[in-house]
Amino acid sequence: MKLKPHHVALTVKNTEESIRWYQDKLGFQVIHRYNKHGMEITQLKLENVRLELFCYGQNTKPLPDYRKNLVDDLHVIGTKHLCIEVDNLDEKIKKLKGKEVEFIMHIDTAGFGGRYIFFKDCNGILIEIYQA
């Protein structure tokens, strides 16, 4: 049996703002939109990466403070961040800075090889870009 990731699900505070952010900053495209159980659900795709955005409108709870800091959040059980692999980290950073993305750290090297850097989306969700 073959296993492969299908999507990463993210709860967002505003569907339209989040769609625009992921389209403008990272190049994702909307592939499905629907409502179910009182929430808006949107699927986005960029090459082989799919995101599923959930929004409960005014009933959406804010991101807890401990989830806003990369180091603090690593101490808590659960999913940590979205990581997208790129061919050229320096080029991607330059493009994202040109789109007013603010990075929360300097480039670092992974213990298993490669380089990475983190930033946050418009909801404060941590995103890593990584080059092997």
Summary of predicted features, one role per range:
Residues 129:
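Short glycine-/small-residue motifs
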Residues 1-4, 29-83, 93-120, 132:
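Vicinal oxygen chelate
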Residues 12-15, 36:
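Conserved beta-strand-loop-alpha-helix junction that forms the acyl-donor binding cleft
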Residues 14-16, 87-90:
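Helix N-cap motif at beta-to-alpha junctions
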Residues 9-11, 83-85:
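Short hydrophobic/aromatic beta-strand micro-patches
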Residues 18-23, 96, 124:
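Conserved active-site tyrosine of GNAT-family acetyltransferases
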Residues 21, 87-89, 112:
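Tryptophan-centered motif/residue detector
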